[in-house]
Amino acid sequence: MTKLLYITAHPLDELGSNSMAAGKTFVDSYKENHPSDEVKHIDLFNEDIPMIDKDVLTGWGKLRNGDELTSEEQQKVNRLSEILDEFLEADKYVFVSPMWNLSFPPVLKAYIDAISIAGKTFKYTAEGPQGLLTDKKVLHIQSRGGYYTEGPAAEVESGDRYLRNIMTFLGVPSYETIIIEGHNAEPEKTEEIKAASIAEAKELAKTF
């Protein structure tokens, strides 16, 4: 059975967020067009996503040396392993995020750190790092109040660019986007911009 992870990094729901509205439309259409697939929603703002901190680094070091971990170290290391295992079990990933300060919310970076693990999602070879997620698909749905796809602002856009780069690093061969932008720059076009993203999400879900 094909499994899709719907990974949202937004504190608002579809009523308050253009990206979440497009994401919900995508998931509804995907379920309709792929009834035998499993879809799981991971709401990063309501999940325990440990930061890679001193406890984690120390815990990983103790595991390599066969030493005993503290309860705090063990709890965080175990949780990170659960996150990674769940990610690896899936076949497709849909990330939903807003643009915050030219990037995306920090909870998404914490999640990416949790799944970017040497020996699991990539490996080191004599020729350099090699991604291991060679049979996966990714979609990123991101909303931006201004215009960052083209023009001078494109150079400072760091959210979708980073996600695309890290997924390529991990070996993902298929990366697609639904970019919703300009609704703050041109508020009179807000409904038009939102409607276009909803239509795009519904259509893309049919073949994703």
Curated annotation (Swiss-Prot):
GO terms for molecular function: electron transfer activity; FMN binding; oxidoreductase activity, acting on NAD(P)H as acceptor; oxidoreductase activity, acting on NAD(P)H, quinone or similar compound as acceptor. SUPFAM superfamilies: Flavoproteins. FMN binds at residues 17-19, 99-102, 143-146. InterPro entries: Flavodoxin_fold (IPR003680), Flavoprotein-like_sf (IPR029039), FMN-dep_NADH:Q_OxRdtase_AzoR1 (IPR050104), NADH:quinone_OxRdtase_FMN_depd (IPR023048). Its cofactor is FMN. Keywords: Flavoprotein, FMN, NAD, Oxidoreductase. It catalyses: 2 a quinone + NADH + H(+) = 2 a 1,4-benzosemiquinone + NAD(+); N,N-dimethyl-1,4-phenylenediamine + anthranilate + 2 NAD(+) = 2-(4-dimethylaminophenyl)diazenylbenzoate + 2 NADH + 2 H(+). Its EC number is 1.6.5.-, 1.7.1.17. The keyword NAD applies. Transmembrane segments: none annotated. Binds 1 FMN per subunit. Quinone reductase that provides resistance to thiol-specific stress caused by electrophilic quinones. Belongs to the azoreductase type 1 family. Homodimer. This is FMN-dependent NADH:quinone oxidoreductase. It comes from Staphylococcus haemolyticus (strain JCSC1435).
